[in-house]
């Protein structure tokens, strides 16, 4: 084993948060070592946004993040905003566009974002060790000692930025939680978030709709999202479903308004105006035909509107505006875009991300109990948390 190398900070995890933290601390004059077990940095960045990286959102606000401590993310998000990251992207002359709902994407490739962050790390003379699994972490005499590969490094500051277990095929693990617990930090039970929901046997009729999508309002508890929902061979997916999945708990129903643009009384009004129109045809004016037929069958109304009682049409309206599904579960971490739960926010300073119980230990990014909406919110949390920790380590917080 080679001799121990000394640094001011060791950062574990070269994802979005780790890269940002390393760059900021390095540019503040700190000697930084960034370690990752993967053979390339920013692997989740590279696959995000269909390869174009949905790198932030113009609508970022604290109430669009979930946490057992809902106020925790406010400070970091206020101090490093979406506009700050956009300015960084612009300085690197990366072309971008707004797609929908404030979501910003690269015109070119997600590789541009990774290259930008690597260039920022280079400006701070950050040493990056890739393909280096962490074998041991110890703490004594005010320094953290990390054994990685066949090497040992030491620093007074250690940053946990290894993410959560979502998308394990990318090498994601629960290492952050294991390390946090070792240092006495509490962990909020991790669970898949922004994840497709599965449906049980009683919903088999909907499986024939695999691949069919429609704009809906999906609700669970107090959460409500108007976006596309997609039927799959296992259940429900699409942006609206991924959004509510973060709020869903086993046993809770998910209700869907299949006709969010229709006013109350639309079916009875159509009967007066177009009595010869078939009920499933009427629904099909707002949703795909296959979905319209299945919904009409499940409701039990078929035929011309003229032959259907007003009372039945009113009941159908109510059901179509709040169709209840009882998910049997989710598709798990393998299909989850992010992880909810994680290192308890109450254990950390919201200003610096430093552990209250363990000076010099920091936690940032997906491994912390802060989970954003779909659409660039989680990357903005990564940038903001990484920036806050980097500033603190650099003495500029």
Region locations from a protein language model:
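Short hydrophobic core segments
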Residues: 10-12, 35, 134, 153-169, ...
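Glycine-rich active-site loop/strand segments that organize a redox cofactor
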Residues: 50-98
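A conserved short coil-to-beta-strand element within the FAD-binding core of flavoproteins
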Residues: 130-143
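A glycine-rich dinucleotide-binding beta-alpha-beta segment and adjacent secondary-structure elements
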Residues: 130, 294-371
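Core beta-strand elements of the Rossmann-like FAD/NAD(P) dinucleotide-binding domain
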Residues: 5-7, 148-157, 225-226
């Amino acid at each position: 084993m080679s001799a121990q190398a000394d640094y001011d900070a060791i950062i574990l995890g070269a994802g979005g948060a780790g890269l940002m933290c390393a760059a900021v601390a390095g540019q503040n004059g700190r000697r930084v070592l960034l370690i990752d077990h993967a053979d390339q940095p920013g692997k989740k960045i590279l696959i995000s946004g269909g390869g174009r990286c949905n790198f932030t959102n113009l609508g970022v606000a604290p109430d669009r993040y979930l946490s057992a401590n809902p106020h925790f993310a406010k400070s970091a998000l206020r101090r490093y905003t979406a506009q700050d990251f956009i300015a960084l992207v612009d300085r690197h002359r990366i072309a971008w566009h707004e797609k929908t709902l404030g979501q910003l994407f690269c015109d070119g490739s997600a590789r541009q974002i990774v290259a930008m962050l690597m260039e920022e790390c280079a400006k701070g003379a950050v040493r990056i060790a890739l393909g280096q699994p962490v074998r041991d972490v110890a703490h004594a005499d005010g320094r953290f000692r990390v054994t990685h590969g066949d090497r040992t490094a030491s620093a007074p500051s250690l940053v946990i930025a290894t993410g959560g277990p979502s998308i394990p095929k990318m090498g994601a693990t629960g290492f952050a939680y294991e390390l946090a617990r070792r240092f006495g930090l509490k962990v909020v039970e991790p669970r898949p978030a922004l994840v497709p929901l599965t449906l049980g046997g009683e919903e088999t009729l909907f499986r024939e709709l695999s691949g069919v999508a429609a704009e809906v309002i999906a609700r669970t508890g107090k959460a409500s999202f108007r976006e596309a929902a997609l039927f799959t061979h296992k259940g429900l997916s699409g942006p609206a479903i991924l959004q509510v999945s973060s709020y869903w708990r086993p046993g809770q129903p998910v209700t869907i308004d299949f006709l969010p643009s229709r006013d109350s009384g639309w079916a009875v009004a159509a009967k007066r105006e177009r009595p010869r129109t078939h009920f499933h045809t009427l629904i099909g004016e707002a949703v795909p035909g296959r979905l319209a037929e299945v919904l009409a069958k499940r409701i039990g109304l078929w035929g011309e509107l003229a032959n259907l009682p007003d009372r039945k049409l009113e009941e159908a309206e109510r059901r179509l505006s709040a169709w209840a599904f009882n998910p049997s579960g989710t598709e798990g971490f393998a299909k989850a875009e992010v992880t909810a739960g994680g290192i308890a926010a109450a254990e950390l300073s919201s200003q610096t991300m430093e552990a209250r119980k363990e000076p010099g230990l920091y936690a940032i990014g997906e491994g912390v109990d802060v989970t954003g909406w779909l659409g660039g919110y989680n990357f903005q949390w990564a940038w903001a948390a990484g920036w806050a920790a980097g500033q603190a380590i650099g003495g500029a917080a």
